[in-house]
Amino acid sequence: MDKILIRGARTHNLKNIDLTLPRDKLIVITGLSGSGKSSLAFDTLYAEGQRRYVESLSAYARQFLSMMEKPDVDTIEGLSPAISIEQKSTSHNPRSTVGTITEIYDYLRLLYARVGTPRCPDHDIPLEAQTISQMVDLVLERPEGSKLMLLAPVVRERKGEHLAVFDELRAQGFVRARVNGKLYELDELPKLDKQKKHSIDVVVDRFKVRADLQQRLAESFETALKLADGIALVAPMDDEQGEETIFSARFACPVCGHAISELEPKLFSFNNPAGACPTCDGLGVKQFFDTKRLVNTELTLAEGAIRGWDRRNVYYFQMLGSLAAHYGFSLEEPFGELSAEHQKVILQGSGKQSVDFKYLNDRGDIVKRSHPFEGIVPNLERRYRETESATVREELAKFLGTQPCPDCRGTRLRREARHVWVGEKTLPAVTNLPIGEASNYFGQLTLTGRRGEIAAKILKEICERLQFLVNVGLDYLTLDRSADTLSGGEAQRIRLASQIGAGLVGVMYILDEPSIGLHQRDNDRLLATLNHLRDLGNTVIVVEHDEDAIRLADYVVDIGPGAGVHGGQIVAEGSPQEVMDHPDSLTGKYLSGRKKIVVPAKRTPRNKKLQLKLKGARGNNLQNVDLEVPIGLLTCVTGVSGSGKSTLINNTLYPLAATALNGASSLEAAPHSSMDGLQHLDKVVDIDQSPIGRTPRSNPATYTGIFTPIRELFSGVPESRSRGYGPGRFSFNVKGGRCEACQGDGLIKVEMHFLPDIYVPCDVCKSKRYNRETLEIKYKGKNIHEVLEMTIEDAREFFDAVPALARKLQTLMDVGLSYIKLGQSATTLSGGEAQRVKLSRELSKRDTGKTLYILDEPTTGLHFADIQQLLDVLHRLRDHGNTVVVIEHNLDVIKTADWLVDLGPEGGSKGGQIIACGTPEELSEMKQSYTGHYLKPLLERDRA
């Protein structure tokens, strides 16, 4: 069967659609945000494909797999087993790295265990165990006739006269020994100074090199190795200064005896006690109480320079008072003006020195005690270590910072594992290379003999997997990069690379916007990868808005015509050209140029005197860059993937602004020199795509603050007042008005053991979340449940006479969310929808015109028409005098910005510089800018 037939799909907002898709093709599903693309791709096709495959397994196996809900569809024919690659961040486990997720690290561990050469950490000598035959062969390779002696080092740098050692050697029949580098007969030894360190090597054999010595040498080596615990020396007989050769029969340093057991893959795993650094347990970082977060240096101790140790906490404040009296400093002096010595005593303690403390007990008596002062930091460390309360830990964690582990310097591995070499690099050195460079290194690595044979297969796997990561535009990442620092787009492309590495055939892959976070330049490589996946013999279904991806597809499905209740229908399907020619397809209109996002006729000029100036930013790969952001304009930060955009804006500019303007104490900015210009602003808002809530109880009404006035309206109805109902009666989070059978969830979870848990509608309230008495209260003929079921569009009309509500509902409509329900569960909102709910909350606040808004890729999940709406909102914020900074790859957003900052020139270590600044027109003329290169034809086309 060469087709996938879908009949009667009604999942979520799909309106009983019938669809026939070709198999083994690249299919793009597009349409407005919220039109039903994910409902078709993930909740129907993927859910059914995965469910059928899992159902073919035994009941025992099924209990270990999470099964998806059966989609609401009549029939689907021609399905293959399905694999979905979504945008979710990979892992929040601090032990996950790019290397471990892609499994490249497992191959690297195997490579280093099987062909690695351990070296002594102190003397840099290879620790190689040799057999006696190998030792004999090496000696016989010397020029014939060479006079040599074989020595056994019996004492190494030890104090004493060592008389017992010499007696033992004489008893065994030895005649000569070398003491501190000089040869002596054992009967004519000098007296040794027992206060000094000495080295003694006994002469086991003296010989001239010739071919028939094999048997004699083997016996002599055996004797020497037995005497000196596996170590033997060969030195020239006549030349005391001559170079000697050290032989070892075990993995040990012949100089200091540093030994290592046989190399095993577990020695290179930081998730195994055998390989993890014992200081940081393989995490690479140590937590510490950061005094910068702990102390407000501008306040006095009495005012609360250290939270919890001010006047309000009598016990601790009495302690500080006694300490101040003992050391002679004032509690009324700003902490920053106290001497360094006094600051150290307060924070780190008085050591062993006792201090006289006076405490006022509950009865008003003064109690005197003399003891050392623990210090605020040790006090917090002890409380953090000993407490069993999660709340206390959470509170104290706000003051914790992290720093690289002092022992392993962030490499996570123990000392032995850090000193094993393959070629010219250790394992930490390889994992610290950008993937592109690591790929080149292993591609050129040549190992000879037995090692070469063993390594060949492992190297082939490593090189292939690294190349797949390069192909999806991730050549700038390093293998030791922590997984929780990856963006959604990066995480998805890593999964994509892993799937290509698996080389499966006949599978249905479903991807969710793989182009997120990719610069136009890297997009071509990604599309080639998707084609490669299709050419292997797979059906590749992509939910995508990217123009290039739609044009390249074999088959396009456009869902619409609107979003939410207005969507869920197939508007157009067929080749890209057929969709472009379709009169009703919104996507087709934008692709064919009948509709377009217009470039502003003129740019808002910048005022050079009003700028945010960030100097010397050095976080991650940033190379001491100076950033200037014009105040009151829409600035777009662009650059290829991995060039340092997020580090510059999210990790440096935002924490600095949030600390200065919002008083955030738990945010730490990446290294930089100075920040200027924040005095022109009054607050900063970071609008990201994280969920607005992680439980079904969170919804747009609660998040935007609409629900409170709605509950107040219901509590003000005469019937409510006569019954004594307050606003709390209409909350489904507290007892009173909610249905107690389902605790206000509307659903009841039923555990099904080896089948997926199912949520069944609550029998008591019929999914309405409230009890019967609460639902009897009506406002304008509707009860609270019916209001929550309204779409934003309907609610706007319904509450038209309530200005506070009408304004907030209007802003939700302005950001393109007219179709979502007021009470829609936050867990069902896409990333783009969650971001727009946050945007609307900001828009509905009273505007001071002095806010800095930061958005990271706000076009994720947005169709051309949605982008137009988003731009209208951003321009509206800008027109009110606010400063908007957007990190973006979408050329439609870039071309409408007032000012561009382009980072590059490449990603990773080859990036981290600001290579161009200016208006879109200026940037398009700059040869060094990749963004300008793609922007130029677009501006020319739009101006035409």
From Swiss-Prot:
Q: Which Pfam families match?
A: UvrA_DNA-bind (PF17755), UvrA_inter (PF17760)
Q: What are the GO BP annotations of this UniProt entry?
A: nucleotide-excision repair; SOS response
Q: Which residues form the ABC transporter domain?
A: 309-586, 606-936
Which sites bind ATP? 31-38, 639-646
Q: Which CDD domains match?
A: ABC_UvrA_I, ABC_UvrA_II
Keywords, A to Z, come to:
ATP-binding, Cytoplasm, DNA damage, DNA excision, DNA repair, DNA-binding, Excision nuclease, Metal-binding, Nucleotide-binding, Repeat, SOS response, Zinc, Zinc-finger
Residue ranges that the Swiss-Prot or TrEMBL entry lists as coiled coil? none
Tell me the compartments it is located in.
Cytoplasm
List cellular component terms (GO).
Answer: cytoplasm; excinuclease repair complex
Task: Check the record and name the PANTHER family matching this protein.
Answer: UVRABC SYSTEM PROTEIN A (PTHR43152:SF3)
Q: What is the annotated role of this protein in its UniProt record?
A: The UvrABC repair system catalyzes the recognition and processing of DNA lesions. UvrA is an ATPase and a DNA-binding protein. A damage recognition complex composed of 2 UvrA and 2 UvrB subunits scans DNA for abnormalities. When the presence of a lesion has been verified by UvrB, the UvrA molecules dissociate.
Q: How does it assemble?
A: Forms a heterotetramer with UvrB during the search for lesions.
> Sorted alphabetically, which NCBIfam families does this protein's record hold?
PRK00349.1 (NF001503), uvra (TIGR00630)
HAMAP family, sorted: UvrA
Q: What is this protein called?
A: UvrABC system protein A
Organism encoding this protein: Pseudomonas putida (strain ATCC 47054 / DSM 6125 / CFBP 8728 / NCIMB 11950 / KT2440)
